[in-house]
Amino acid sequence: MDESKENRKIETKELVRQYLKRKYPDAQFSDIDLDFLVRYSVKKEPSANTILKSIGNDIQTEQAYYNAHPAVKAAKDDLQYIYGRFSQKQKDYKNVFNGSFEAFLAWWCEKTPENGIRHCCYCGVDENTLKDAFKNGLVISKKPSFSGELQIERKDPDGDYCDNNCEFACVICNNAKSDMISAEDFTKFFVPGIKEYWEHIKEKL
């Protein structure tokens, strides 16, 4: 492996380490775990069993590895979920983070607080409240894309999906702002009412 590829591998491994530390603060991930997650869930090498064999893991199969390391299975699923969000944006828009999942993951990690709980960039509602509101039927939508997941918002709707133009936003804020209102005007004129709405929802949870 040439030096530039090795440096990128180290950078990606450190990025995954930082994200998992925030999302799974009580879990322990070995270097082998991190190597596996980088190659399988980020680099998208096709065979988990081949990766495990090449990195010197003594467990023979992917499922046995997950059985012995449940935190790795959870982390793998989490990283694949993030990749799914990236892939969906790529289908719908051009030039999403310059086509780099690693750049997207770096942005995702940057926007994930130390406690692992993300918030809407406008009204501040946390993703746990958002998920609970949908789960309990307090917020309902017929549109599948309107869910308890935080959406990826472009502050400037005419700009690209990139690290300095994207934030997480709740479905209420993202839908209300659309592409007609500037972030500044939306924050000034609409956000106070949306904050009151979420406080009303929290009282019912």
Language-model segments: which ranges?
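Histidine-centered nuclease catalytic patch
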Residues: C121-F168, K177
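A detector for short metal-coordination/catalytic motifs
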Residues: K111-P113, E149-L150, D160-L205
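Short, charged surface segments at domain edges that flank catalytic/cofactor-binding sites
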Residues: N67-E127, D158
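Mixed-charge, low-complexity interaction segments
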Residues: M1-Y83
